[in-house]
């Protein structure tokens, strides 16, 4: 499995820094970096799964401390469904 991350701008309003995650040539997830608006929740600067596809399409979208944690979760989910 080869994951590729590509930075993008996402039109969500407050959280614009995004990351597309590809498994090979297939888009499997869109992450957004949570802005300071989320400071009161203690998650500002963390990465949120805006949407996932296939095995990453989950009911409760997770938040990750950093991209390393997000990549590890993506790899685990994809491996479970392989």
Residues covered by each model-derived region:
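Intrinsic-disorder/low-complexity peptide segments enriched for small residues
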Residues: 1-3, 29-32, 65, 76
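Acidic interaction surfaces
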Residues: 11-15, 34-36, 62
């Amino acid at each position: 499995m080869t994951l590729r991350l590509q930075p993008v701008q996402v039109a969500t309003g407050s959280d614009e820094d995004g990351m597309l995650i590809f498994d090979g040539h297939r888009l499997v997830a869109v992450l957004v970096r949570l802005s300071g608006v989320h400071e009161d929740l203690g998650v500002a600067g963390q990465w949120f799964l805006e949407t996932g596809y296939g095995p990453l399409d989950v009911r409760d979208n997770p938040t990750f401390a950093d991209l390393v944690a997000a990549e590890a979760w993506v790899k685990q989910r994809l491996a479970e469904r392989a």
